[in-house]
């Protein structure tokens, strides 16, 4: 029996969305849907970004509105 849990660590700017720093670009819908599906299958998804403070909150809120949550 394997206890392996896949972990996806994804960057925000230029990966989950087009790079428009300090704003937020268009979503990478294909990747976001892939991560949502993997998470429903038990994978862990981590946001790996250099955004901090209000810019980090904006990024997390943006992802949540698109249905992507993080572990």
Task: Provide a role label for each language-model segment.
Residues 2-71:
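Alpha-helical substrate-recognition element adjacent to the catalytic core
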């Amino acid at each position: 029996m394997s206890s392996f849990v896949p972990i996806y660590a994804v960057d925000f700017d230029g990966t989950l969305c087009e790079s428009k720093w300090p704003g937020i670009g268009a979503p990478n819908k294909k990747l976001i849907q892939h991560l949502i599906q993997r998470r429903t299958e038990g994978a862990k998804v981590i946001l790996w970004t250099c955004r901090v403070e209000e810019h980090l909150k904006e990024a997390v809120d943006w992802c949540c509105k698109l249905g992507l949550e993080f572990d």
